[in-house]
Amino acid sequence: MKISGILLFSLLLVLESTAQNKKQRVIADNKKQYIFSDTAGITASYIAYHGDRFPLTDLITIDSLSISQASLKGKTVFINCWFVACQPCIAEIPVLNELEKKYRSDSTVFIALTFDKADRIRSFLAKKPFHFQIASLPQADIDSMKKISFYPFSAILNRQGQISFVLVSWPGGKDSDTQLLTLLDQQFKKALAQ
């Protein structure tokens, strides 16, 4: 068990360093924009398209708060899919917290979906705060919502509940936080205006 854990951790480190050395690629089609790490190895055909509804179900957060479909109507929603052992996921949390702080209001909702168990999430949050409303779901449920299994994954939904932006596997690297914040800020402003 220990050896397989060490091997998995080593593989994740290699994959992470490879991802950070690659540039991002943008797939654009009729004002639809999807950004992927070059290492993601996916095309836009795997992603729910711009204008589609994100199939979010009613949720219960790890703090026992209810997030219903009805409560999201008319709100701009940021959804992030992550997990505790995902280093790229963890690396982007400070940027996501900054975005949440800037746009926190009654007309916005920031949701983080993870397949980690509530106890593990709480232990993680004690060391590294994440200011989104966090819900734990089975991994298969999360992957079926976002239609791919890559992490981290973020989607911005406009007030009509339609996907206005998708980001998969941010590549990291020098000035990465600033670039990511600028990109997400621009895309969130667009969604607020829709």
Predicted regions and their residues:
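Conserved redox-active cysteine motifs that mediate thiol-disulfide chemistry
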Residues: 81-98
